């Protein structure tokens, strides 16, 4: 049970199936998944709905390369089962589901999509702060280098990722679940 702050009401949903699935992995199952409804009491926004359906899965003894390949094949199989051929149109963009999904690391994606950011200035906090000011990206005085890079990624890169893409090497400083 939790109280939803934005809607001022009591809700009875779990936040994730993680604990139950990990117990199964510890119990000897090598691969597990669940499709479920979850709830996160983190407010409402265009990027976040507190109640949502998700799929969560775990595979013992595998690495993130295996997981990316698995997800790619899962989506291709799903689209094929739904009768889509080579492309699907989403928000007037043709998504080619036959090509290998792009894999690009977090920092390289910023360099790729932000013309004036390079490997030489990507870790220069003063430069990034100035970049943010010139591109209407809000930065707090307390923000770290990685948080500022994340703000740039969210504002300048995310919207340009049209084709299926895996962003790897996400900074651990801004995501407790990344490695």
Regions found by a protein language model. Give the residues of each.
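Class II aminoacyl-tRNA synthetase-like tRNA-binding/catalytic domains
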Residues: 1-66, 76, 133
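Hydrophobic (often cysteine-bearing) scaffold residues that line and stabilize catalytic clefts
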Residues: 13, 17, 67-71, 145, ...
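Internal, well-ordered alpha/beta segment that forms a basic, Gly-enriched binding/recognition surface
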Residues: 17, 30, 63, 74, ...
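Metal-assisted phosphate- and nucleotidyl-transfer catalytic regions
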Residues: 81-179
């Amino acid at each position: 049970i939790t109280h939803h702050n934005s809607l001022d009401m009591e809700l009875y949903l779990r936040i994730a199936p993680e604990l139950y699935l990990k117990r199964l992995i510890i119990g000897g199952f090598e691969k597990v998944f669940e499709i479920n409804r979850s709830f996160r009491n983190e407010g409402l926004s265009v990027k976040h709905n507190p109640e949502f359906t998700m799929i969560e899965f775990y595979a013992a003894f595998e690495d993130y390369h295996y997981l990316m390949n698995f997800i790619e094949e899962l989506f291709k199989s799903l689209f094929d089962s739904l009768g889509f051929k080579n492309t699907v149109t989403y928000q007037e963009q043709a998504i080619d589901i036959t090509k290998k999904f792009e894999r690009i690391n977090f920092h390289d994606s910023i360099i790729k999509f932000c013309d004036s950011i390079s490997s030489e200035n990507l870790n220069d906090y003063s430069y990034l702060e100035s970049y943010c000011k010139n591109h209407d990206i809000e930065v707090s005085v307390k923000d770290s280098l990685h948080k500022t890079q994340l703000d740039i990624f969210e504002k300048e890169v995310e919207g340009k990722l049209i084709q299926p893409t895996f962003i790897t090497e996400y900074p651990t400083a801004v995501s407790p679940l990344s490695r």
